[in-house]
Amino acid sequence: MASKRGSNQDESIFRIPPYYYIHVLDHNDNVTKVVVGPKTYIRQDHERVIFGPEKMITIPPRHYCIIENPVVRNDTDQVVYDNLGQVKLFHADQEIRLAREPFPLYPGEVLKQAVTALKVVQANAALRLRAILDFEDGTQKRVAGDEWLFEGPGTYIPRKEVVVDETIRATIIRPNQAIKLRARKETNDREGTARVTGEEWQVKKVGAYLPGAYEEVVDTVNAYVLTEKNALHLRATRTFVDMKGKTRKNGEEWLINMADTDAHIPDVYEEVVGVVDINTLTNRQYCVIVDPVGPDGKPQLGQKKLVKGEVSFFLQPGETLEQGIQSVFILGEDEGLILRAQESFKDANAAGAVRQPGDRWMIRGPCEYVPTVELEVVTRRKAIPLDENEGVYIRDTKTGKVRAVTGETYMLSQDEELWAKELSPAVEELLQSAKDPVAERSDRRGDRAAPRAREKTRVISFRVPHNAAVQIYDYKEKKARVVFGPELVMLGPDEQFTQLSLSGGKPKRPNVIKALCLLLGPDFCTDIITIETADHARLQLQLSYNWHFDVPDKTDVAASAKLFSVPDFIGDACKAIASRIRGAVAGVQFDDFHKNSAKIIRASVFGFDEKNKVRERFLFPQNSLVITSIDIQSVEPVDQRTRDALQKSVQLAIEITTNSQEATARHEAERLEQEARGRLERQKIMDEAEAEKSRKELLELQANSAAVESTGQAKAEAQSRAEAARIEGEAAVDQARLKAEAAKIESESELQRLTNAREAETKYVREQNALEVNKTKQMSDIETERFRNMVQSIGADTIKAMAMAGPEMQVKLLSSLGLKSTLITDGSTPINLFNTAQGLLGGFSAKRGIEHVEEED
């Protein structure tokens, strides 16, 4: 052994402290001895210290250690040596040493387990011990492999023959709890009951339970608390006797409810299938239980049981509800139930009538009905209210006949059902589109809503617009009828619409227009045809035809049927008209056709009457279609060269016409100019004659005036001067009068202006003063209200304290300084020292009073 301290083995003197020791090897006899301190050991030459100095092992109270290969001691607890002086050892043995005086390890001894505290086992705990050697424990003999418990409270003293497998703690069993135990081998439980290996049992006693040595806790089982609204569904895992003393067979199922116990802890041989809720039925509910449990507790397989409310019950194991809890059928006057018998029984609701399996019948309201277990409810019927323009298709399930019921409220019987009438996809699309056949014949609008699905059991109705007709064919009667609008058409079960597939587009293409109703017109259609003249000029014409159907008597069945004799009357009419036009144009030169196109086309289409005049209409006798007029919208050559030549000829004709009109206008202008010149010369001659006549009269007047001048010149001068004076005086008077009137008008206007200005200014000042007074009044009211609110919010005592705070503070300050009066000023200010303190305090108080008065204002 090597020294743990790494001592220098060449040293000769070893100082061993108290409770220390060393191992010294004697090389002469190869014996190792122990030297215990306190001591100073002088090593001899033939000795070598192989271990130490090392501290002795000290075991405090309630501690222990394990020594391997312990020394042999005699009866007096002394170490035994052999004849060579070497200590004897129990090799491959162990010794457990408890609290004692410190001791050294002798050569060969090994400290297998250091000093360790003894295990203190608490209450409700135990140590599972297992014997690894045979030994006797007092009066009890233990065999290797035996197990037992050291139960607390206590301190466990270990033995070398025993090992501690585990610490077991007691399981706390609370109210409504139990623990499931299993025997690991044959043993007796705490109550002394013998248990075989693998057997399980329960302990329900409330408190702490400490499992035995051969017992193991499998699980803690909680009790199921039962109420009035739930029950516990149990199944036996083996045959046993339950807590009531009843034998339960393996696989048997049963219920435990509150009537049996408030809380149930499942036994070890009971398996909880689930918690079953109570089923509660009101007085308007019922249910059918399948495979009900009989009075003997056994299920009656294949039977049913009707339960009506008010009642509450639990479903027993094996029982099921057919379609769950159902409501009682409350039937009104317009409702009924279709019933079907499942088995033969007497119907108490029908005066004891015997119902055979498969029978169907109907009960009508008003009533309250609960179906029995012998029958089933097929369906619930409700009367279908129908207006005069509404209907439904009904089929008799016994005879297969289909009929239409309209204009009444109808309820299907037990042998009737709604029949769905199928239509072709094209007719379905036309019916669902809900377009107006007159106003919405085009599909160019892309914002149309999605079509609504048709209810196929409803009678198909179609509104025929004014001046239109619809043909309906009855495949059963093999007859057709034509209905003229405005009318509402309702199809019978075997009737179908005659669908129209008309040509459309420009030029006409077949099967473009789909329609159910035939418009009688008048209307127009436009077509583009290609013709060829006698000189092989190919032209393209765009023509528009006005058409209508000539139906003088709509009650005439034969005449009405002729309307639908031609499936595509547009295409046939356009083809017939185009054929006539081509035939007529084929024998005409291009120039003639170009000059007389309208006449040629009208004559070719309408033909001539007995007087060789063009007829006014073209009649198709097959379907009474009448063409009344033709509009030539455009004529264009098909060949490009012909088109260019025609354009040149048209330009040349325009130039010729223009030149002719220009020459005519020039000749007319020259003629008018000559006529105007002649009238002017004549007028000059007449003016000269008139001038000569006027000159003659002038000479006569000059002669008369000369005579008058010679005889009364003086008189005339006097009269003229008098008249001039008179006129001058009247003018001066009028001028003075006008000036006076002008001055008066000016003064009146100025007075009116000043009056208006003063009145306006006075009104403005008055309104401004009123506004100022109103503003001042409102401001004073606001200030008064504000001050009142401030006074109310602060309080009179607070205001008084604030007013007195300044003077009181000054008085207190002066009193604290011991001064009667104080004045602080500079050298340039004169001071009146009379009544100084009173003046200062009075001035301060007066200032506070002034401020207070201002605040009140």
UniProtKB/Swiss-Prot annotation:
MVP repeats lie at residues 18-60, 62-122, 123-174, 175-227, 228-282, 284-332, 333-387, 388-441. Pfam families: MVP_shoulder, Vault, Vault_2, Vault_3, Vault_4. Residues 437-453 have a biased composition (Basic and acidic residues). Expressed in embryos, tube feet and coelomocytes (at protein level). Not expressed in sperm cells (at protein level). Residues 665-694 form the IQ domain. It comes from the Eukaryota. Keywords: Cytoplasm, Nucleus, Repeat, Ribonucleoprotein. It is found in: Cytoplasm; Nucleus. The keyword Repeat applies. Residues 434-453 are annotated as: Disordered. One of its GO terms (cellular component) is ribonucleoprotein complex. Required for normal vault structure. Vaults are multi-subunit structures that may act as scaffolds for proteins involved in signal transduction. Vaults may also play a role in nucleo-cytoplasmic transport. The vault ribonucleoprotein particle is a huge (400 A x 670 A) cage structure of 12.9 MDa. It consists of a dimer of half-vaults, with each half-vault comprising 39 identical major vault protein (MVP) chains, PARP4 and one or more vault RNAs (vRNAs). This is Major vault protein. It comes from Strongylocentrotus purpuratus. The lineage of its organism: Eukaryota, Metazoa, Echinodermata, Eleutherozoa, Echinozoa.
